[in-house]
Structure formats: structure tokens, C-alpha cells
């Protein structure tokens, strides 16, 4: 079980990422646009750097939705490998069976 503070901090980051996503995408478009002037590009870089650090999607951590475990995360289920195994053994994941060949 992850610390509650880490789980809450990650959720706050998710909210920040959503709040600034459009602004961040607009600035990145300006920076990448070959038709934009060097002054406009420099202004966009400066504005992008002024945005909060936690508004960058790179800083998000995929966590288990049940207990917040940060490692061994399986995107397909949104769970950690440990939780997937437990739930699969109990038959709580539809369509998941033990491998047999």
C-alpha cells in the first residue's frame, strides 16, 4: 500500500495536467511551427517554462487504482501485477484465465 500523501499528490498532478493541457499544446505548436518568428518562438519557450512543473504529463506516475502501488503497473487493467494475479485467481477479472499449453 502506497502512502496516502503520494497518491493524493499524483491526483493533484493529474488535475494540473488537465488544466494546462490546452495551453501547453498551443505553446508547443508555436515552438515547432517553422513559420513562426524567432521572437515569437522565444516568447513561447519562455511562457512554457513559466508553467507549473507539475503540469507536465511526464511527471505523472501510473499507479494501481486499488492500493496505489507505483511499480509493476499493467495499463490494460489499471492495476499492479500483484493485484491482477490476486483478482485473476479469485475470478474477478472477466476473460482472464491461467495459461495452459
Curated annotation (Swiss-Prot):
Record's function text: Binds 16S rRNA, required for the assembly of 30S particles and may also be responsible for determining the conformation of the 16S rRNA at the A site.
GO biological process, one term: translation
Descriptive protein name: Small ribosomal subunit protein uS14A
Gene3D superfamilies xrefs: 1.10.287.1480
CC terms in the record's Gene Ontology section: small ribosomal subunit
UniProt record similarity statement: Belongs to the universal ribosomal protein uS14 family.
Domain of life: Bacteria
Species lineage: Bacteria, Bacillati, Actinomycetota, Actinomycetes, Mycobacteriales
Self-association and partners: Part of the 30S ribosomal subunit. Contacts proteins S3 and S10.
Matching HAMAP family: Ribosomal_uS14_1
Keyword annotations of the record: Ribonucleoprotein, Ribosomal protein, RNA-binding, rRNA-binding
SUPFAM superfamilies on file: Glucocorticoid receptor-like (DNA-binding domain)
GO molecular function terms attached to this record: rRNA binding; structural constituent of ribosome
Short name of one Pfam family: Ribosomal_S14
Amino acid at each position: 500500500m502506497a502512502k496516502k500523501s503520494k497518491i493524493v499528490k499524483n491526483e493533484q498532478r493529474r488535475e494540473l495536467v488537465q488544466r494546462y493541457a490546452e495551453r501547453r499544446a498551443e505553446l508547443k505548436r508555436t515552438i515547432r511551427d517553422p513559420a513562426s518568428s524567432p521572437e515569437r518562438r522565444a516568447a513561447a519557450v519562455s511562457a512554457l517554462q513559466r508553467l507549473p512543473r507539475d503540469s507536465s504529463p511526464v511527471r505523472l506516475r501510473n499507479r494501481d487504482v486499488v492500493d496505489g502501488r507505483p511499480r509493476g503497473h499493467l495499463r490494460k487493467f489499471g492495476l499492479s501485477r500483484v493485484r491482477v494475479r490476486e483478482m485473476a485467481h479469485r475470478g474477478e477479472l472477466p476473460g482472464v484465465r491461467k495459461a495452459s499449453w
